[in-house]
Amino acid sequence: MKPKKRQMEYLTRGLIAVQTEQGVFVSWRFLGTDHETTAFHLYRDGKRITRDPIAESTNFLDQNGTADSVYQVAAVNKGREEKLSKKARVWQENVLEVPLAKPEGGVTPDGKPYTYSANDASVGDIDGDGEYEMILKWDPSNSKDNAHDGYTGEVLIDAYKLDGTFLWRINLGRNIRAGAHYTQFMVYDLDGDGKAEIAMKTADGTTDGKGHIIGDEQADFRNEQGRILSGPEYLTVFKGETGEALTTVEYEPPRGKLEDWGDGYGNRMDRFLAGTAYLDGERPSLVMARGYYTRTVLVAYDFRNGRLKKRWVFDSNQPGHEAYAGQGNHSLSVADVDGDGKDEIIYGAMAVDHDGTGLYSTGLGHGDAMHVGDLDPSRKGLEVFQVHEDATKPYGLSLRDAGTGEILWGVHAGTDVGRGMAAHIDPSYKGSLVWGIDPPGNDGMSYGLFTSKGEKISDKAPSSANFAIWWDGDLVRELLDHDWDGTIGRPKIEKWDAENGCLKTIFQPAGVLSNNGTKGNPVLQANLFGDWREEVIWRTEDSSALRIYTTTHLTRHCFYTLMHDPVYRLGIAWQNTAYNQPPHTSFYLGTGMKKPPKPALYIAGSKAEAPL
């Protein structure tokens, strides 16, 4: 049975050109809609510079290129050359700077000033031109973890084109508290018109991108501790092009009894997650969630014809769902884990099926990190690697079958394992290596380094368990982290030296900072343009701009853009959710890999012709 085709966004070739010491590095997309035999001719200044079509990669080093050169690429199918792509001018360095309209700070009701810094971002094509726009969250300097009292500044959401053109700003208002657990924003084409929408939790006083107020503009539900434990809660879908509110419904589930969520002061009640999933296998649905320490509720919606229609509700308080309480993480993942072509929600140590029924619960409980992908390519299907917080549970680290919940192996820790990573970092071992560490980053001696089969290959694991990134030209994944001095983080990309058991820094740009304190997150990591390698975005020290860094390493490996992989693309959508986690692919990408399967997709909207 052929899988259903999934709705996907229209993308151009994403051609980029970067000046290097050896010449001009040129890179472009191989699309999920391309035939596997598609090859490419490259043009410089209107003249073809390739004698034969390039068939084995989608990058090229033009040793005769200059800083003033202009490039185009054309696909070649069955000997016939297609239209030329959009023109690409040469970057002088491997970075694109996106200027920002930094907002002014303010003063809280108790007289304390605050400023803003650029925080999490997502991307989507909000105008249908095949190029990504940036949706950015501004974080006030007084943003709070839920465990802490205090007023916060207002959360702002901006939209920019990648040339820095400011498009609109949404102000979530005084009745949305600032912090990693409060605002999770989904950027995705939810209705299939070829243009992405933005969906997130709102409240009385939220101002949309057109200046319209949602609810009661004068309402102020903050208590003396700066918390918001009463008043209406909403879910709003905004038009991507303008930031205009398209529809607003009551946020489900409502607060109910504070104690149901795990405490009596509003900490665990206000733990929100969000994701996008193809619950019918063809079109995306919005999934909004509340709670994971005890009560856990997920609600799925379809956005069609300008309205939100509820698809299902999963509530751990429902009879028969008791085993699903207290299993969620500070993040989630989305993938078809049971092979039926429809997505499931992997919610920490549990999973919810595409139809809103419980798929399984391992009972191992809450954790701070989780990775879902083809971690063990010798097995059929996907796996989940997770670290766990409850010292009384049998495992502090576990690897399970993503579809059944079967624990394949685990490691007893007897303590809260704070961070964990799964990535193919050593070509000597097929599949991912996995490890857990305790922040702020010890050497992993307490848990060790394991293969996906559970073989302990070293007492010493990498000290980094933050993000993994495909950066250089081989199939081994690098690690993305930062140097933390107690107040700020200096981002870096490192490569694992298995022979010497250490990390070696291969890229560390100046003038940029990491996000989210000790977590060291980028603004966003995603395959934004060029070939299949990933870009990474960090903020400048003063948050006056974002800097998008791309690799200039040549590679002979050729895959379709990761943004056309179903698991990876949805990973970009949920990356901003709470404790940011890196995206993974639906297939094993690493040493000894098989050729990735061609994704089953169709292009949404009016741009269904072959992209340029």
UniProtKB/Swiss-Prot annotation:
Binding-site residues, Ca(2+) 8: D472, D474, V476, E478
Residues annotated to bind Ca(2+) 10: N527, F529, D531, R533, E535
InterPro entries per the UniProt record, alphabetical: Ig-like_fold (IPR013783), Integrin_alpha_N (IPR028994), RGI_lyase (IPR041624), RGL11 (IPR034641), RGL11_C (IPR049366)
GO cellular component terms listed in the entry, alphabetical order: extracellular region
Annotated localization: Secreted
Molecular-function GO terms, alphabetical: lyase activity; metal ion binding
Organism domain of life: Bacteria
Enzyme class: lyase
Amino acids binding Ca(2+) 9: F529, D531, R533, E535
Positions bound to Ca(2+) 1: D120, N576, A578, N580
Keywords assigned: Calcium, Cell wall biogenesis/degradation, Lyase, Metal-binding, Repeat, Secreted
Binding site for Ca(2+) 7: D374, D376, R379, G381, E383
Residues the entry annotates as binding substrate: N119, D139, E154, R174, G205, R222, R419, N516, G517, T518, Y579
Binding site for Ca(2+) 3: D189, D191, D193, K195, E197
Residues binding Ca(2+) 5: D336, D338, D340, K342, E344
Record-linked CDD domains: RGL11
Assembly notes: Monomer.
Name of the featured protein: Rhamnogalacturonan exolyase YesX
Protein encoded by which gene: yesX
